Amino acid sequence: MENLFLRYTNKYPVYQSCCGNVKTHKSTVGELAPGCVWNVKIPANITPEDYQKHQCDPNQTKTIGLMQLVDTILPNPVICYHTCKLNLYNAIKRQALYVQKPEDDFVEKFNKWSYGIWETEIRPLLDDFKYSYANWYNGLTRAQQLEIKPWHNGEQEVPFANNFNMFCKLEKQEVTLNNGEWDWPKNRCISAPEPYIKFVTGPVVSALQELYAANNVKGYCVDKNWDDLGSFYNKCMSKGLYMTVQGDISGLDRSVTKFLLEINRLSYRAVADKVFHCNPELFKFFLCEDTTKINCKMFEKMTMKFRGMQSLLKLGHINIQGTRKSGEYPTTHGNTELVSRLIRYVMEVVLNRDKDSYELLVKGDDFVIFMVPCDQEEIREAFKQVFETKGINPDGKCKYKSGTALKFLKFGTIFDTDFCSTDTFYCKDCQTHRVTRKLQRYYTLTPFTRNLWSATPREIDNYKNALHVSDKKWSSNLELFECFGSRFKSQVWPCRLKRGKAKEKIPVEDGFIDENEIDHLQEYMNKYQVFHKSMIRDTFWNSYKNHPEKPPKECCNYWHKKICSIKYGWTMEEIDEIIRRIKNYEPVEDLLLRGFNHNDKTYQADYDFYLRG
């Protein structure tokens, strides 16, 4: 494996970040999109042998990637890609790949229907649209505020230049075993806009996102926390919508062609005349212009302590038309609106279902449909009329309708929902659905962190304890999680938490950061004596935003085990054995792998589960 063991730091093993290899080359194979201008020093099309020649020198360019906090219980390697020549090439080439043009007849029908939806459901919400620049600005970190300071203070003019910078996100990812071979994941490439683009688009897009969420726009699931999801599942259950259809759009960002972008641009043009913090023409330019320049640049030596002293290496740029950039403000909002509109077209036009006969959750490229149990083949055929469906029917010759492709389409029930890397179970005693992390991802990824490259033993112990306490917000009384989560509990030395004050942020005329939020966070952190490092503070803050207000009760443990026994094919006795082995630090790999590779999907049709004792 290329995830090479590097050294020990404070008794914890530390691993190097990863470079590309011959297995990641296949994701770069393909022709450039029409109109794409390739000005990168590495040729657009190279052989696997030449591809490997650009691998970075471990002694000069590799950063420390992951620290292992506790022993792992699964054999799957965990890797972390970094920004280097090869990974940047991989990212920029995937962004520039050719995507099939949508069919003209589909475009005409879909645009007509979609515009009608926008006129009746979205346009009325925008008539009284308002946004607060102060609220958006106060929500930024100090570093983010300094980044946009020249334009915030009027020191510089915003140029009409739609420029982005490509980089590789440091993110821990699991390497999975597929047919006896390790299947390497793609690196996470981010096209980050220049700071002045964030200044122009950020306040308005954030307000649109809040507006859609507050008015429960059909399918819009941005800003929903786990309590909201549990309540939503309860509503679906009360309406008898037990059957679920889950899917994921493959390569959505680069698949978003000009005609699909028009779905979002209708709203942007409608609110452009209400933009006051900058020139409205700039707002329309950055959100409605087709041509984008994406730069490729990196530091020659990726050493963390002296990064500012390293020379900047420019690898070139590409000019591309009509795609979504993964790091821009409208990415989550725009993709959610787009995918929900496409799924609604399948349900309401192709299948001729009433809008109120089903429920829909969409966030980015993930979606779940909740409906009354029906013929699965009918649903498959309907999706084939809109999406490229190789994931549904590998042997069939399929056509692109919308120009987008489904990665998979999975049928199940409410308790089979794994929306956005979460799992769901129903506690009959509490009469509610509970949302947790996915069990396999929790066991595989949690032991590793990328936040502690130069931490002291004291800081590491505080970070581990922060993970333990924050996980208790959603895993309390669930033995399958608690038995492993208890490994992170550390002895924490008393330490003084330095409270961040509002004056640390750059003030604006009509508001400061909400002091109540700071006090609330400080109270929670003081209770557990958490060190004031930002990485630990963020761990707790994410728990407050996303995790449930009330943790699971003791009665939830039985129902969680029952769901896992159905999903993974374990008996209740085997689940107790798994818990015992994990608590006693005994090997448990055989039982876990058998369950996670369980192929019996009969539970997906078990619609009467909720009615049984």
Residue ranges with predicted function:
Residues M1-G613:
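Viral RNA-dependent RNA polymerase
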